[in-house]
Amino acid sequence: MLNLDFTHKTTQATPRLHAVATEFLRVSNDVAELHKLSSKLTSDPYLFVEFVKTIRGFLSVQTALGLSGEIDTVFLQVIKGWFPDLITETFSFLIVVRIINLFNKRANSKVYPDILRRIGNNALYLTRNPLRGICLVEKAINVRDPDCTVFIALKLHSHYVELSFEELGSNIVEKLLSVGESGICGV
């Protein structure tokens, strides 16, 4: 049984979040019940996003991930739909990273390119977040996936000068220009 007593106050102010967290705690040993609860939670994406932003929600979802492929797929679908909102928050960012790693371990080759495409499509938004967003865009460029790099280059094209004046943004511009020189994409 998972002990989340120390996180009780993080969801106590919002009754809906508290009810979901309590339910997760109650069914944490039953995979079938966790699947039902995961489906119920992700049916309201706003609730899911708010839930995984709390430490209690993060820990609850973290324990459910990896227990079954069905649970992971349910969470992946909501992550795809709410990617920009989840990727810039501390705890939900860790959930996204964990689910990417789970699908990579299972050799599901479709998830990683899909996430890279989402990073590319949201590159401008992500560069506005200096902690996670810029680092994520930089890592996506380092993967050297041509499609992702082209998406990033196109989304940031008219913002190179602005980014070059930012401490971490200049790294992205430098990497895009070096990738462009190597002939991977026309930057």
UniProtKB/Swiss-Prot annotation:
InterPro entries: ARM-like (IPR011989), ARM-type_fold (IPR016024). One of its GO terms (cellular component) is cytoplasm. Pumilio repeats lie at residues 20-42, 43-78, 79-116, 117-154, 155-187. It comes from the Eukaryota. Keywords: Cytoplasm, Repeat, RNA-binding, Translation regulation. Sequence-specific RNA-binding protein that regulates translation and mRNA stability by binding the 3'-UTR of target mRNAs. GO terms for molecular function: RNA binding. This is Pumilio homolog 26. The keyword Electron transport does not apply. GO terms for biological process: regulation of translation. The lineage of its organism: Eukaryota, Viridiplantae, Streptophyta, Embryophyta, Tracheophyta. The keyword Membrane does not apply. It comes from Arabidopsis thaliana. It is found in: Cytoplasm. The pumilio repeats mediate the association with RNA by packing together to form a right-handed superhelix that approximates a half donut. The number as well as the specific sequence of the repeats determine the specificity for target mRNAs. Its main location: cytoplasm.
